[in-house]
Amino acid sequence: MGVVDPKTSQNTSKKRIDRRIYAEHFGPTTGDKVRLADTNLWLEVEYDLTSHIDHQPDIDSVNIGEEVKFGGGKVIRDGMGQSQLLGEQVADTIITNALIVDYSGIYKADIAIKEGRISGIGKAGNPDIQPNVTLPIGAATEIIAGEGKILTAGGIDSHIHFIAPQQCETALMSGVTTMLGGGTGPAEGTLATTCTPGAYHIHSMLKATDAIPMNIGFLGKGNVSLPAPIVEQIEAGAIGLKLHEDWGSTPKAIDNCLSVAEEYDVQVAIHTDTLNESGYLDSTLGAFKDRCIHTFHTEGAGGGHAPDILKAIGETNVLPSSTNPTRPFTINTIDEHLDMLMVCHHLSPAIAEDVAFAESRIRKETIAAEDILQDMGAISMMSSDSQAMGRVGEVIIRTWQTADKMKAQRGHLAPDQSAKTEQSLDNIMLSPTDSDSGNDNFRIKRYLAKYTINPAITHGISDEVGSLELGKWADLVLWSPAFFGVKPDLIIKGGLIAAAPMGDPNASISTPQPVHYRSMFGSFPKTVAQTCITFMSSAAIDKGVDRQLGLEKVIKAVHNIRKVRKQDMKFNSYCPQMEVNPETYEVYADGELLTCEPAEHLPMAQRYFLF
């Protein structure tokens, strides 16, 4: 037995089938377009690794007819698409014919998973009888059918208030597989701020989440003017620090926190001073001293210097994000926010100063501008602000609702020069995204990056998660296109299925009602220990914190953080010169007035949640 000669194989069959029939059997291929849920966003398949020799989208090298598919009378059978290779030579799991949607490209491929990581992306099959097989299938291989499905990396929510452990399940079922933030439960400090303060609480939360099927990292409290209290939190296991105005985000605290972060290579996240008590925006920017920092909800109502926190977006060292309560701007956004804000920040409607504080944060002009800044790639990330005004299960939904609203209001989004340069440097293929192509690939990559690769880069975990690339942790989400972004088909953690919609367990098959999301085998404690990651600082790992606490999850260090700049944000690196009129709240980016109308109707909404 030996590898088949591709030249000989090319002559074995010349039968052709209609493109529609092909898509029904194997999913869309190069040039086909797919609608995302009920939005007006259309992706186009850029190339197809399952049916091209040498992985090139060249019409002269097509090898259609060798696709693999599982099922009765289909390809993946002994002696056909399944080889005789031993387990160590084949993948543990193959996802067949999936449409990968990633910042790195929108393309068709088979995906191999081995020991919890993505071990290959290419062409699966039996190398003894099929040409150009890069991912051998054997008796040790499980198959997940990706035909007609979209595959993405698991989402990353980088703004979590750990108020309730049930958030983790809700987030997982929405397609989020990594949660970064702080908290200790429904204490007032956690209800308002994303801090896990001190070694005792950090250790307690690390132990409490050790059996939860989610990658997790905790932020310590950064609001202190001397280094030692910050150092002890980093060495206790924090992945970084959070500065929050409710604890006092003074220039001294900011400078001190960033100085320690520089020494320990961890990230600092900040919620700036809404009341401008300890200084104005320029005071805060000055305290940054050109050091990289993740500015939480750099937008209209999340909190921060009123009314001009949006100006921070123009700084090259600032890595800005939005939270989802203001995403996108709708006719209900303003009315919803006042009560939410009062509860979240322990304010009283009976105290005039508290009401004034809340009202100062809610400005329709800056919320509207936030939509456009997201679409321009000036705001780099999206997150939830879970149970602290944000909805933990709606990061992905709100991201794509914003993208759809911006297409409706701003039209087609063509690649900008920075994105072309970025893709050239990364050897990423640009699809035809001119106004005549009819696809939204560029906009799709821009918005997908906001909750996948960009928060991973920002927090020093992009070696492990954040994209669908060779060698990364197999945190994957499989979607039916009609339900993309709303209800996943499968959530895969570290190569095992952790959650899925499942019917009555007593039924004769898996589909009878009631169908709802249930935990699968990959979410139970002994498997969580191999499929999920706890992130810590290198200093904590060096001190053996994980061993001292008896943690069972995979432990990984955050790293390569302090040199990150806005230009490193994939598809979201625009640094405009920002101006905010202090009287009218009008927002300008590079001299352009940013304004848009609130949406009256949204996709991915009620029709998906009737039952």
Curated annotation (Swiss-Prot):
The modification N6-carboxylysine is found at residue 242. Pathway: Nitrogen metabolism; urea degradation; CO(2) and NH(3) from urea (urease route): step 1/1. Residues 418-434 have a biased composition (Polar residues). Keywords: Cytoplasm, Hydrolase, Metal-binding, Nickel. It is found in: Cytoplasm. Carboxylation allows a single lysine to coordinate two nickel ions. One of its GO terms (cellular component) is cytoplasm. The active site is at 345 (proton donor). Residues 411-434 are annotated as: Disordered. The keyword Metal-binding applies. One of its GO terms (molecular function) is nickel cation binding. Substrate binds at residue 244. InterPro entries: Amidohydro-rel (IPR006680), Metal-dep_hydrolase_composite (IPR011059), Metal_Hydrolase (IPR032466), Urease_alpha_N_dom (IPR011612), Urease_alpha_subunit (IPR050112), Urease_AS (IPR017950), Urease_asu (IPR005848), Urease_asu_c (IPR017951). Pfam families: Amidohydro_1 (PF01979), Urease_alpha (PF00449). Ni(2+) 1 binds at residues 159, 161, 242, 385. Its EC number is 3.5.1.5. It is an enzyme of class 3 (hydrolase). It catalyses: urea + 2 H2O + H(+) = hydrogencarbonate + 2 NH4(+). Its cofactor is Ni cation. One of its GO terms (biological process) is urea catabolic process. Its main location: cytoplasm. Ni(2+) 2 binds at residues 242, 271, 297. Residues 154-611 form the Urease domain. Belongs to the metallo-dependent hydrolases superfamily. Urease alpha subunit family. Heterotrimer of UreA (gamma), UreB (beta) and UreC (alpha) subunits. Three heterotrimers associate to form the active enzyme. This is Urease subunit alpha 2. The lineage of its organism: Bacteria, Pseudomonadati, Pseudomonadota, Gammaproteobacteria, Moraxellales.
